[in-house]
UniProtKB/Swiss-Prot annotation:
Principal location class: membrane
InterPro entries for this protein: GlcNAc_MurG, Glyco_trans_28_C, GlycoTrans_28_N
GO cellular component terms listed in the entry, alphabetical order: plasma membrane
The protein, known as: UDP-N-acetylglucosamine--N-acetylmuramyl-(pentapeptide) pyrophosphoryl-undecaprenol N-acetylglucosamine transferase
The keyword Hydrolase belongs to this UniProt entry's keyword annotation: no
Membrane topology label: Peripheral membrane protein
Amino acids binding UDP-N-acetyl-alpha-D-glucosamine: 10-12, 124, 177, 275
Pfam families associated with the record: Glyco_tran_28_C, Glyco_transf_28
Keywords per UniProt: Cell cycle, Cell division, Cell inner membrane, Cell membrane, Cell shape, Cell wall biogenesis/degradation, Glycosyltransferase, Membrane, Peptidoglycan synthesis, Transferase
Enzyme Commission (EC) number: 2.4.1.227
Pathway as given in its UniProt record: Cell wall biogenesis; peptidoglycan biosynthesis
Places the protein is found: Cell inner membrane
């Protein structure tokens, strides 16, 4: 069997693609990847040899575009979907699995036009525009936040490095795969207070702020573990006892898999405020704290860090997500729906 995996744009979407690829390989399913020249798709998968083939199309997002530009983008997407139909024929694609994001649009529409099964995984608590549009036409729609809960695909390595946290010795700041300027500034402002408490700093700052953050820590004579981006984030997480993080869904569930307690600062401009609702999923179970970016008081925030019951939260996070989530999705999509697959 050969399937197409499509979608991306951000690290969160692409992490799911990688999990699905690894699961498909275990089941002897070949995968073709269809993404975009824009976003992070090429950086993640251009050199990924496990795909049968990879295509990076000229697809673009439509968020914040004018009405004319949106119409133009839609017409361009329909043109690209024709190219995808040719890809499907050439590689004998039997099903399409979308993880969302604008780069999923051409292949997803092509699946419908080609009468191929379309399986969609929505990573966030609030569905993106493309997934909302396609949901009624999908063969199966998966979400960890829906009433019919589906497992969230998280790489095994995050589970393998899990441990129960009991004492705050190391704190990790996570701004997402591209970094976050606000969280970087927060980390730098908290650094002297953390040093006074002998709390070590691990800091993912993104490429744009790397030199600035590095120099600031040096000026404070603080030996922080600072990095722009890491494909082995689980190695950084396992050394941490608390995370200060944005609330992208992949990051949130990776933290849960690692049983790493977190304070979330949702990105305030995320579509439909989905990062807030992602974090609220845990807050409603008393498994995290949420601070809104525009109302953070540094002293109050620091007090909250010190008050957290790390052991209680870390222990209960073990029940939030489960290992082999991607395996379960592949099973539910492809093997439980064989009547739809030619």
């Amino acid at each position: 069997m050969t399937i197409a995996l499509t979608g991306g744009g951000t690290g969160g979407h692409l992490a799911i693609v990688r999990c699905l690829l690894e699961s498909a390989i275990k089941k002897n399913i070949e995968c073709v990847y269809i993404g975009s020249q824009n976003g992070q798709d090429k950086a993640w998968f251009e050199n990924e040899v496990r795909f049968k083939e990879k295509f990076f199309l000229s697809s673009k997002g439509v968020v914040n575009q004018s009405k004319f530009d949106k119409i133009s983008s839609l017409l361009h997407t329909l043109k690209l979907s024709k190219d995808c139909r040719e890809i499907f024929k050439k590689y004998h694609i039997q099903a399409v699995f979308s993880v969302g994001g604008y780069s999923a649009a051409p292949a997803s529409f092509a699946a419908l036009f080609s009468h191929l099964p379309l399986f969609i995984h929505e990573q966030n608590s609030k569905s993106g525009s493309l997934n909302m549009l396609l949901k009624p036409f999908a063969t199966k729609f998966f979400s960890a936040f829906e009433k019919e809960i589906s497992p969230y695909p998280v790489a095994d390595k995050f589970f393998d490095n899990a441990r129960i946290r009991k004492e705050l010795k190391n704190i990790i700041f996570l701004g997402g795969s591209q970094g976050a300027q606000f969280i970087n500034e927060l980390a730098l402002n908290l650094a002297p207070k953390l040093q006074e408490q002998n709390i070590k700093i691990i800091h993912q700052c993104g490429k744009n702020d790397f030199e600035k953050c590095k120099k600031h820590y040096q000026s404070l004579n603080i030996q922080a573990d600072i990095f722009d981006f890491s494909l082995n984030l689980e190695e950084k997480m396992k050394n941490a006892d608390l995370a200060i993080s944005r609330a992208g869904a992949s990051t949130l569930f990776e933290l849960c898999a690692n049983t790493l307690p977190a304070i979330f600062i949702p990105y305030p401009y995320a579509a439909k405020n989905h990062q807030y609702f992602n974090a609220k999923f845990l807050q409603d179970q008393a498994l995290c704290q949420i601070f809104m970016q525009n109302s953070i008081n540094l002293d109050e925030f620091f007090k909250s860090i010190l008050k957290l019951n790390l052991e209680n939260i870390s222990t209960r996070l073990q029940n939030i997500t489960q290992k082999n989530g991607a395996d379960m999705l592949i099973q539910k999509a492809l093997f439980d729906n064989l009547t739809f697959i030619r």
